[in-house]
């Protein structure tokens, strides 16, 4: 008698698990595409905020470009995730927009988008896409005062200073 009760309980548990797993798979299938579209729309809105008035084109060899950027990047624990070409109405390349992820955030990964103009090698915009920083000081990275200070700065190496920025390569 005890063996049949254990078998019945195992069978019931198996049936419940199969139904729950199937339900989760169906929900995932239904929601995967809308979630992906919403994420892509948010990413493109961020790209437009860091380089406005242009259209974006995929770069044919972007995988090679991203690998080269990651191999030569002077920043540790960071990687370039995406690179798009910014083109004007005439199809001329006016800059690039890229997203990158740094694993050096205090609370985890920090993902950013940045636009760079090829005409003057200046940053056209900067936006934090996602972060897990602590409320207070770390989360201030999403405030306009912080993000807007990058626009117009040299796309080369930037230095963080405690006092007011005195040169094109400093942020405060």
Which residues does each predicted region cover?
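Flexible, solvent-exposed loop/hinge segments and secondary-structure transition points
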Residues: 1-172
């Amino acid at each position: 008698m005890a063996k049949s009760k254990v078998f019945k309980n195992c069978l019931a548990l198996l049936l419940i698990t199969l139904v729950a797993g199937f339900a989760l798979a169906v929900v995932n299938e239904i929601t995967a595409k809308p979630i992906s579209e919403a994420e892509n729309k948010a990413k493109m809105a961020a790209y437009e905020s860091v380089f406005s008035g242009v259209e974006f084109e995929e770069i044919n060899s972007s995988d090679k470009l991203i690998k080269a950027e990651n191999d030569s990047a002077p920043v540790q624990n960071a990687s370039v995730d995406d690179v798009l070409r910014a083109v004007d109405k005439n199809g001329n390349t006016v800059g690039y927009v890229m997203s990158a992820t740094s694993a050096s955030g205090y609370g985890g990964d920090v993902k950013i988008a940045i636009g760079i103009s090829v005409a003057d090698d200046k940053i056209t915009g900067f936006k934090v896409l996602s972060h897990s920083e602590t409320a207070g000081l770390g989360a201030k990275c999403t405030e306009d005062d912080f993000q807007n200070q990058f626009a117009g700065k040299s796309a080369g190496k930037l230095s963080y200073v405690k006092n007011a920025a005195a040169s094109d390569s400093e942020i405060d």
